[in-house]
From Swiss-Prot:
Annotated compartments: Nucleus, Nucleolus; Cytoplasm
Family: Belongs to the BRX1 family.
Protein name, as recorded: Ribosome biogenesis protein brx1
This protein's UniProt keywords: Cytoplasm, Nucleus, Ribosome biogenesis
Region (Disordered), start-end ranges: 1-22
Pfam families listed in its UniProt record: Brix
Stretch forming the signal peptide: none
InterPro entries: Brix, BRX1
BP GO annotations: assembly of large subunit precursor of preribosome; ribosomal large subunit assembly; rRNA processing
Length: 295
């Protein structure tokens, strides 16, 4: 009898179509009911790095993961030549965006942002990076909160910048109702273009209780870094190059130029030394016969 009673009580009551669906707010991204007309946007970012990243690069990656609750962090990728395998990895984890840190020579850091599985893919060179621990800023925001993405108006001036803006928006933008996200907006992420580079900053939105001051103040949290666009591929880690930055100079070429300058300075010193020896041999002072008169 108890089994029959449980089966009867577990049956759902018929739904009344005349009644409107009650609005239940989403808490921590786990709610199943939404307001009428709300369609959740499913965005999930696969975050991983290559072998050989330094501790500063690893800490920067961890800071970005803490800012993106809709991300899925995976272990390091062993191969740097077969990046197309990241598409299979993204499909395995049900991710539609890929955020990949590639480290070379333990000095240069490259960032790949791709839309899986069909692309496009943008490759950046990351420099001037500073983690939250290094900056030690006073700003603080709720972990898992959704940010306001502030893009420079320069992003709308060129077609390739519009593509970059869309990929950055899908990567750093946390959709409403995302998993592990909080229903709060208390920070601003700014992406500004200056000197042909993209500058990333993260600020806290703090309200001032003093009415004589501005009602809202922005306080930097961190991290901060600068990105330079290298190229844009049509596919996800493959396909034809649809944009290439001709003004980009790699760090390897810069270091090679510095070494060549140092080597050229050494060559110039040796040539000057040889010229002094030749002049000394050509301009020999003749012996004076009167030097040995009183000897």
């Amino acid at each position: 009898m108890s089994t029959v009673y449980k089966l009867k009580t577990s049956e759902r009551a018929p739904k009344n179509e005349d009644e409107d669906e009650e609005y239940v707010p989403v808490q921590n991204g786990q709610g199943n009911k939404h307001s009428a007309g709300f369609v959740p946007i499913k965005q999930k970012v696969l975050v991983l790095s290559s072998r050989g990243v330094t501790y500063r690069q690893r800490h920067l990656l961890n800071d970005l993961v803490s800012m993106m609750p809709h991300s899925k962090k995976d272990s390091k990728l062993d191969s740097k030549d077969r990046l197309y395998q990241l598409n299979e990895l993204a499909e395995l984890y049900n991710c539609n965006n890929i955020f990949f840190f590639e480290s070379r020579r333990r000095e240069d850091l490259y960032l790949h942002i791709a839309r899986a599985p069909n692309g496009p893919t943008v490759k950046f060179h990351v420099e001037n990076l500073h983690t939250m621990d290094e900056l030690n800023m006073t700003g603080n925001a709720l972990k898992g909160s959704r940010p306001i993405l502030s893009f420079d108006k320069t992003f709308d001036t060129a077609p390739h910048l519009k593509v970059v803006k869309e990929l950055l928006q899908q990567t750093f933008g946390i959709p409403k109702g995302a998993r592990r996200s909080k229903p709060f907006i208390d920070r601003v992420c700014t992406l500004t273009i200056a000197d042909g580079k993209i500058w990333f900053r993260n600020y806290e939105i703090r309200e001032n209780e003093d009415k004589s001051k501005d009602p809202v103040t922005l306080i930097e949290i961190g991290p901060r870094f600068v990105m330079t666009i290298i190229n844009i591929l049509e596919g996800s880690f493959g396909g034809p190059v649809i944009y290439k930055n001709d003004t980009f100079v790699s760090s390897t070429m810069v270091r090679a130029a510095i070494r060549n300058q140092a080597a050229q300075r050494y060559v110039n010193r040796q040539e000057s030394k040889l010229e002094r020896q030749v002049r000394a041999q050509q301009n020999v002072i003749p012996e004076d016969p009167l030097d040995n008169v009183f000897a």
